[in-house]
UniProtKB/Swiss-Prot annotation:
One Pfam family named in its UniProt record: CRCB
Keyword Oxidoreductase applies: no
Chief place where the protein resides: membrane
Name the record gives this protein: Fluoride-specific ion channel FluC 2
Record GO terms (molecular function): fluoride channel activity; metal ion binding
Protein's organism: Frankia casuarinae (strain DSM 45818 / CECT 9043 / HFP020203 / CcI3)
InterPro entries the UniProt entry points to: FluC
Taxonomy of the source species: Bacteria, Bacillati, Actinomycetota, Actinomycetes, Frankiales
TM regions (residue ranges): 9-29, 46-66, 78-98, 109-129
Length: 147
């Protein structure tokens, strides 16, 4: 190993540890949601849909907060964004749920689920980011008037 690579190795290990810890938190939260709100076979997978939509909304809020509002520690984004929210949202379960619907003869529902999930995820991240930007701008205007 080169000297330069050795110098950066502890940072890479720390980054991996932070992402892994966040991923464990997010995955446990998703699993908890599936226990509280189980999906019956052959029905629309509301839990996965809701988790992915909520996770995308949270990603929209997080990105505004850490890019537009304040500078945070460099490990906050990997921990919360890649780790917690990456572990909370789930593309693999999304695909598995769709495949189970197809296998159960519910192809139309599977297609609706696939399309609605993508639309909801993109809409959630966009709407949450826009709402957070509006809220931040409004808060700054109000604070500016008080000063």
């Amino acid at each position: 190993m080169r000297r330069r690579q050795l110098r950066h190795a502890p940072v890479a290990v720390l980054l991996l540890a932070v992402i892994s810890a966040g991923g464990a938190v997010g995955a446990c939260a998703r699993y908890g949601a599936s226990l509280v709100w189980p999906t019956m076979p052959g029905t629309f997978p509301w839990t996965t849909w809701a988790v992915n939509t909520a996770g995308c909304a949270a990603i929209g809020v997080l990105m505004v907060l850490i890019t537009d509002v304040r500078t945070v520690h460099p490990l906050v984004r990997p921990f919360l964004g890649t780790g917690v929210l990456g572990g909370f949202t789930t593309f693999s379960t999304y695909a598995l749920d769709a495949q189970r619907l197809v296998d159960g003869g519910r192809t139309g529902l599977a297609l609706a689920y696939l399309v609605l999930s993508v639309l909801a995820a993109l809409g959630a991240v966009w709407a949450a980011a826009a709402a957070m930007r509006w809220f931040v701008a409004r808060t700054r205007r109000v604070a500016g008037r008080r000063a």
